[in-house]
């Protein structure tokens, strides 16, 4: 669960992110620059703008923390609007005047969970009758990082495996006994926005054990594991966010070394 992939280039405007700007734009010749036009990846990695996602995301985060703005410089991209019509529509929708200066404002953001519910090669979990596929599942095919578009192949392969496995089950095994549990009076939940803010601070691209421990201490004051008799969809979503954030934090603390998308902040 500690392996959360951050994409380096999300379209950003006034501190908000609006969508992903594909690495194909850099592959077509775009460069990552700061507000002064400096090539920010030039001294970071031999592959510069085409370095692995985790390396680029960490480098851009360091630039932001140093007070810089980051842009994709499109001057060397041929026929950008023709080759990237959907990205052009996204930029136009948010009224970013990239045609005037050939610059797209970007920043890193959370993108993909390499971890998830542990499954075998058929998509089965440790709970009989429960299957997981796609980003919710941890099939092991991504390891500590993920190559672009491999998640699509994962979904194609494992959805077929899951469907075949379920189809081959005897009819009597296709129903499960409901899980009995004591119902709580109500959830004790944090404000969703506060949870997201604290989780982002503790579980961001480069992490600190102290900040993760502080986050877990804060999270421990809430009871989000006891299902009440009555709850709203928003409450259930927030409770699930708490569970996922707790799992990521605990897994991150257990992983002492830097590996792939999981990296400790240098002191």
Give the residues covered by each predicted segment.
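Short secondary-structure transition/capping segments
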Residues: 10-16, 111-113, 144
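FAD/FMN-dependent oxidoreductases across multiple families
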Residues: 85-131
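Generic signal for short, ordered secondary-structure residues
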Residues: 15-16, 70, 96, 101-102, ...
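An anion/pyrophosphate-binding glycine-rich loop and adjacent beta-alpha core
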Residues: 2-102, 156, 165-171
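Glycine- and aromatic-enriched mobile tails/lids
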Residues: 38-42, 49, 59, 112, ...
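Short linear motifs in intrinsically disordered
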Residues: 19-24, 107-108, 244
